[in-house]
Amino acid sequence: MKMNEKVILHDMSLRDGMHAKQHQISINQMISAATAMDEAGIPLIEVTHGDGLGGASLNYGFPAHSDEEYLSAVIPKMKQAKVSALLLPGIGTVDHLNMAKDLGVSTIRVATHCTEADISQQHIDHASKLGLDTVGFLMMAHMASVDKIVEQAKLMVSYGANCVYCTDSAGYMLPDEVSLKISALRDTLPSSIDIGFHGHHNLALGVANSVAAIQSGARRIDGSVAGLGAGAGNTPLEVLVAVMNRMEIQSGIDLYKIMDIAEDIIVPMMDQPIRVDRDSLTLGYAGVYSSFLLFAKRAEAKYGISARDVLVELGKRGTVGGQEDMIEDLALSMSKLCK
């Protein structure tokens, strides 16, 4: 993209941040953070369970409030920001889509594993027909070749998506790979289709990868204020805004205000520091889905097996988002082998 075009920054702290909070963000915290982001000029804010609409379950975790309660509380408070919702086919349904639309959600992001775009057809088609900003979200994009990512993106566009994301769910990708995949998407898809990038900070490359994506043609970039998100967190938005200001890339976001939100609102919400520790670093190194981190830590406490060893084995097995139930089974099996 041209560097004088505005980049749309999309906050994840109230959705991906749910993973770090075990889905226990209160309504008051949600409103406080969202209204401050709105005032700072953040144009898009994602609000749902960490695993998207309908994610409340024994497998993924029960939230403090329902998606409907969160969306009903936040959307009427917004003055300029729009609210998005994530949906994973097999977790979220068309009924959830209709509910989100009725409550005022403007953007639906339909997420699949990077080789399974075909399961998104029903949801993307329905969201598009509802008149929503409809995004295809290819997760764990490091696990597929450039050609496969392009192939899957074309499927999502054919279903009705007006934007497709290359999603580094594991925080595994290096800037060269980001540039290669984003460039291929931009060169192949129609100019009317936006390209997006979603990064995690497990190798401390969230900002660098996001800049590489922008320089390669991405117009939408995800991040979280103070990095609040799964693993070592998402790309920290306040840092990205500062870097973009230095590079004279427009975002429309007030840097000082977003810095203050990070320090005064988001950091006090954290149950533990969002940082690159040995376990989150292992996520990035082994290419493991970032939301597996707390599941692995809980398994470590329960079975006495190193979370790091569990994560490495999950990486070897090529596990993907949605297979959280395998983590405890694996830890139990590993603990028996150690006895």
From Swiss-Prot:
The organism of origin for this protein: Marinomonas sp. (strain MWYL1)
Positions of the record's site feature: Transition state stabilizer: 15
HAMAP family recorded: HOA
Domain of life from the UniProt record: Bacteria
Sequence positions that bind Mn(2+): 16, 198, 200
The keyword Lyase belongs to this UniProt entry's keyword annotation: yes
A family per Pfam: HMGL-like
Protein name (record): 4-hydroxy-2-oxovalerate aldolase
Active-site residues, record numbering mapped to chain: 19
Molecular function via GO: 2-isopropylmalate synthase activity; 4-hydroxy-2-oxovalerate aldolase activity; manganese ion binding
Family: Belongs to the 4-hydroxy-2-oxovalerate aldolase family.
GO BP annotation list: catabolic process; L-leucine biosynthetic process
Binding site for substrate: 15-16, 169, 198, 289
Residues of the Pyruvate carboxyltransferase domain: 7-259
Keywords on record: Aromatic hydrocarbons catabolism, Lyase, Manganese, Metal-binding
EC number from the UniProt entry: 4.1.3.39
Known catalytic reactions: (S)-4-hydroxy-2-oxopentanoate = acetaldehyde + pyruvate
